Amino acid sequence: HSDHLKAVFGDCEPSIVVTNRVSAAAVRRYFSAQRERPRIISLDALPDSLASSWTPVEGTAEDTAFLQYTSGSTRTPAGVELTNRAIITNVAQIFQALQLQMPARIVSWLPMHHDMGIILAVFVTILGLDFEVMTPRDFIQHPDRWVRRVTAGKQATYTAIPNFALELAARHAKDADFSHVDGIIIGSEP
């Protein structure tokens, strides 16, 4: 994990790093030896009142929305620039392929640093959907919680999950009524 982070930070040379209060000191120590250190922002330390001063950023379809890094499992992680157009196109394709029934809710435990997790988060934000998120750790420790959350609602529910996790949930969860689950995206493994 440390080698991956070093490769990513070395490649993108961030000017800002967003973290939380718990991790802020460790993040500052990590960057302390660098001559050009990024600004460290603890998101959970910002006052709620700050939101009222936010103004939308002007941008074009071809502007880079964010960098998505490869896993680095076979070589040094590489940053891929995702444009606003690419993300909106991907969201539209998912919406069309799933034939979403509205109102819809999304349940996920996928980490935001994973491509499925971040695109899912963008997807629900753009469409203004209900979004229930649990941590990957919570899922691994209690996969039955995810099953209970997915099957809890009475509205059309969708989720995304890798193969291994679906198998884990099937082994540990009790019988559940999936009649309101309209779609499960299964992916990220061969």
Question: Language-model features: where?
Answer:
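Short, conserved loop/helix-junction motifs that constitute active-site signature segments
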Residues: G10-C12, S32-R35, D175-H180
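Adenylate-forming
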Residues: I16-R28, L46, D138, A156-P190
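Short beta-strand->loop structural element characteristic of the AMP-binding/adenylate-forming
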Residues: H1-I16, R39-L43, G79-E81, D130-D138
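Beta-sheet entry/capping signal
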Residues: S15-V17, R39, D63, A78-G79, ...
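Conserved G/P- and acidic residue-centered "switch" motifs that form tight phosphate/ATP-binding loops
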Residues: S73, G128, S188
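Conserved AMP-binding/adenylation subdomain of ANL enzymes
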Residues: I88-R105, H113-T157, H172
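Conserved pre-ATP/AMP-binding loop-to-beta segment of ANL
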Residues: I40-S42, D48-Y69, R75-T76, N90, ...
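Short hydrophobic/charged patches on amphipathic alpha-helices used for structural packing
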Residues: K6, G10, P56, P143-T151
